[in-house]
From Swiss-Prot:
Family matches, as InterPro entries: Peptide_deformylase (IPR023635), Peptide_deformylase_sf (IPR036821)
Cited SUPFAM superfamilies: Peptide deformylase
UniProt-listed Enzyme Commission number(s): 3.5.1.88
Catalytic activity, as annotated: N-terminal N-formyl-L-methionyl-[peptide] + H2O = N-terminal L-methionyl-[peptide] + formate
The family this protein is said to belong to: Belongs to the polypeptide deformylase family.
Catalytic residue list: 171
GO biological process, one term: co-translational protein modification
Taxonomic superkingdom: Bacteria
Lineage: Bacteria, Bacillati, Mycoplasmatota, Mycoplasmoidales, Metamycoplasmataceae
Keywords: Hydrolase, Iron, Metal-binding, Protein biosynthesis
Protein name: Peptide deformylase
Keyword Lipoprotein attributed: no
């Protein structure tokens, strides 16, 4: 049933990626429910063995050209992630470190401690051939975000750490018209001073 969704990712240099998104009304209408289901279908399928999509762990509505404050994060409980990220408290039976569509997300707290992924970040909206993608992307190690949970059908606050916090901040940037390449400092591309590297 979910395969009816047509997925077209907006990529640089499209200007919509540089625009700020706007909050949506709660309760969700049919259009926003369909948007959430499209995001779930797209990213979940992208993590499968026979996917036609570029693999991803998150997507923001603006990446479909839709300026709405909503993103989906689906981070599998992958031993390659958890072994290098000791901040995650993961039970072996948990399939995901995090999985939900969040509407109207707002950061209400962030840690002073900073973190980055050792090989840098990537993005579905930034083609792999786009220049100046190499370098550490500095993020807050922990953040608290409030918003509306699609799966729980209520307002919630999430306290996320490590890799999941990085993914959250990557998607939150999209909602503010920013991309990960904006956060790479060309003067210290791989400088690890003052940050934890995963």
């Amino acid at each position: 049933m979910l395969t009816m969704f047509k997925v077209e990712i907006v990529q640089l240099p499209k200007k919509v990626l540089r625009q700020k998104s706007k909050n949506v009304n709660i309760p969700l209408n049919k259009t926003n429910i369909e948007l959430a289901e499209k995001m779930i279908y797209h990213i979940d399928d992208s993590q499968g063995p026979n996917t036609k999509f570029r693999p991803g762990v998150g997507v923001a509505a603006v990446q479909y050209g839709i300026l709405k404050n909503v993103f989906y994060v689906c981070v599998p409980n992958d031993s390659r992630l958890t072994q290098r990220d000791s901040s995650q408290e993961v039970k072996p039976e948990d399939k995901y470190l995090f999985r939900d569509v969040i509407f109207n997300p707002e950061v209400i707290w962030k840690s002073d401690e900073m973190v980055a992924i050792s090989q840098g970040e990537g993005c579905l909206s930034v083609d792999e051939s786009w220049p100046n993608q190499e370098g550490l992307v500095r993020r807050h190690m922990e953040i608290k975000v409030k918003g509306y949970s699609y799966f729980q059908k209520k307002e919630m606050i999430w306290h996320v750490k490590g890799y999941v916090a990085i993914v959250f901040q990557h998607e939150l940037d999209h909602l503010n018209g920013m991309l990960f390449i904006d956060r790479i400092d060309p003067k210290r591309l791989w400088d690890k001073s003052g940050i934890k590297v995963l």
